Amino acid sequence: MFGAAIVSSSLAIATSICFLFFSTPHKSFYHSLFLSSTFSTNESISNHLYTLTKRPHIAGSAANAEAAAYVLSTLESYDIRSHVRPYYTALTYPVRRSLTLATTVRDPPIELRLEQEIYEDDPYADVADQVTPTFHAFAKSGTAVGLAVYVNYGRVEDYSVLREMGVNVSGRVALARYGKIYRGDIVQNGYAAGAIGVVIFTDRKDYGGDGKWFPDEKWMPPSGVQVGSVYSGAGDPTTPGWASTEECERITDEEVEKSGDVPLIPSLPVSWESGDVVMRSIGGMVANEDWQGGEGAPVYRVGPGPGVLNLTYEGKQVISTIENVIGIIEGVEEPDRYVILGNHRDAWTFGAADPNSGTACLLEVAERLQKLQKKGWKPRRTIILCNWDAEEYGLIGSTEWVEENRQMLASRVVAYLNVDVAVSGAGFEASATPQLDELIIQAATQVQDPDNSSQTIYDSWISSTNSSLVGRLGGGGSDYAAFVQHIGVPSADLAFGGGYPVYHSMYDDFTWMKKFGDPLFQRHTAVASLWGLVALKLADEEILPFNYLFYALELQKSVEDLQGDVSGRDIKLAPLFKSIEELKKAAIEINDKKKSLKGRKGWTWTRKDNQNLVRELNDRLMMTERAFTDGEGLPGRLWYKHLIYAPSKYNDYGSKSFPGIDDTIEKAKSLNTADSWHSVQHQIWRVARAITQASLCLRGELK
């Protein structure tokens, strides 16, 4: 009778078994259901992306407000309690810009094109005039006239090479190519070297392909320009450390400039077509081989001159309304514990990959969670879905929200799961704080690879890398920054594909995604599956699936890497090694405790004393990440509280473990004084103390 009633499908069998042995299905049943083909449709994700990218929607624009309304109405249609949280933030827009090149004193200056061309049969030609003119957000208004000097990627080490070559950058206009480091640091490094202005071009070697480009191939067209922010801080620069609410306190423009987070010289982004023109005007020594461009590019020389660049930029700063959309699915057993999923919505232009591939996935996750609720699922902990605004300007929407809710979030958030560019191509990538490594890897074994149905994401992931599977969240590249680096929340960032050629240009549209990024939208579906599964495990498992042993091993490796940097100096790393050993012991102890609880005979989660025991254990697991923060922040960078993960001082995209130690080592190498090396030792002690605090928290002990 039992068997005769359930012969229709394996899913029906699983459902019946669950209902036979449990009053309601086990949470793992719902997790499997979340991944089933009946719960997801590529078409739904495609429709969301198409709708979100119909018009350019830069932060502060009417089009972006319409996109926010679409996200809000979609979440509400899924019966998710949702609201908009507005902030009133300083954003900048271009008013006037020009770039001319004088090649000789006799010839008239060449006006370099700053516009991006509409391509043939462009379906978005009718709204192309709504694309904001190419610019750098928060660039300094002004004019710079000077001999052009080629500075490669504009890194600190590139300027060292130029000094060795005898090339003086002071009083010149630096020509740099995009790549390797954050554009804001390209400008800041140019200023530090004495440049009076910076022009950054999209080099065909890195972005332009081999003679074919979009719409025929995935590569950046000759007129394509990567726009973006050159602000080096996080959040509204006029409200450092507090939320940009209506009529709040703001610091002055002079104080913003003194912060060091906004450039003090003008800059402009240009295409590789314009970059070639400037490069042909530069003489002097031939640049090193690794500084050269790709096939078809002119020979790259360093200058200075004889070409003279005349750069003019005028921008306006306005207080604009930005809108975060927040959806809440309240937990049943622990409503005061939050699992947060976040993605930003604003785009420099159409934003098909960056960021609305992620927004489409967020809405897909929301829809599947609604379907689970209709099947009877209720999360143990509260799930919060966040759609951020003004990320592109400097992580503004997420930062303002975290700053406004700092104490609540610091005491209640279990984890933050970020997806920015969900899909830009093939190949899964993940970064996280180390206690989440095991969870992400485990989830990847349960989701089918979208490009090879015979294997899982984990199978393709592990075969495509020779290094660590999971990266780290030290860079300031997306909305996880406020959660990890400011308040110390365990976090992860997930994506398919790495960098892509049309990044931050007007060619990042639905057509590009449909032709090259994800033609069948299977990668989008896979991101939604993995993102949602990790969230479900964090929301539903009685004992949080954190493993701090991964953290201890990661820190040990980082200290070993430090040894070469302080070799030959009177620097003691013993405090670090000792504190990490204690963390390792604490991690093993709590892992053993989790196993013993799960394996105990007659264990039931409904007993009050067991609930209290598990709650206390979970609090230790949740709060240990907070222990890696320090209220004093990093040296000269108060907002960054995390002593393990934060951006490099000279590259916002990059990072090393122990950023405070790394910064002081670089300074000590430059000054080479006893005091500067003493500062290095002080930072080592600070980190060691933080790791010791983490061990005590994990053990739940008082000394």
Feature locations, PLM:
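Second-shell loop/turn segments in exported
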Residues: 31-39, 53-62, 134-135, 139, ...
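Noncatalytic luminal/extracellular "stalk/propeptide" segments of secretory-pathway proteins
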Residues: 8-9, 24-31, 50-170, 180, ...
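Metal-dependent peptidase/peptidase-like ectodomains
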Residues: 221-286, 334, 388-514, 520-521, ...
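Soluble metallo-hydrolase cores and metallopeptidase-like ectodomains found primarily
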Residues: 126-161, 236-352, 367, 371-375
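Alpha-helical metal-binding/catalytic segments enriched in His/Glu/Asp
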Residues: 325, 341-395, 400, 531
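A conserved hydrophobic secondary-structure block that centers on an alpha-helix together
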Residues: 151-219, 332, 336, 348, ...
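His/Asp/Glu-rich mid-to-C-terminal helical/loop segments that flank catalytic regions of hydrolases
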Residues: 384, 500-557, 669-703
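C-terminal amphipathic alpha-helical interaction region
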Residues: 610, 614-703
